[in-house]
Amino acid sequence: DSEHNAIFQCIHGHEQSDLACIHLTASGGPFYGRDRASLVNVAPEQATKHPTWDMGAKISVDSATLMNKGLEIVEAMWLFDLSPEQIDVVIHPQSIIHSLVEFNDGNILAHMGVTDMKFPILFALTYPERVELPMERLDLTTMKALTFDAPDFSAFPCLALARHAAKAGGTAPAKRSRNGLAPEVPV
């Protein structure tokens, strides 16, 4: 994931004890700004039309429901030895900032880049070197604003469910209730 790659690059060279929290960014997907009632009758085709990333159908649906962000919370816990309380999700519709790391002193480092998975893949394959390839670069002069918003947990219950499972710990993400449905999650 570009988010975890971004976190790794931001924390590299810093002590774990200096880390206050991380902020995973989410574009909000095609349904950003809509409330739960307006999402009742959406069609699968609508969910696959991501506004900033070019992805396959399943990943696009996971993004549209914010389920992917929930899974990224669990991943970040294990990859970076963080508690669920140290992981926040913020909606960033421009998808320019891939994640942010906040330190105990209040400083925040952000990883910025174009929406192209070639960059995090290149970094992962060539680390610790930095290899230059002819790829599109981020042009800071074209950006007019970078905005952030809190996620709407009632409109996107998958994110609430994943956060609940992360806090429960263990194998909670794999557990089901007796009737086979996911447990009711407070939002």
Residue ranges and their predicted role:
Residues D1-V187:
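Catalytic, metal-anchored helix/loop core of enzyme active sites in primary metabolism
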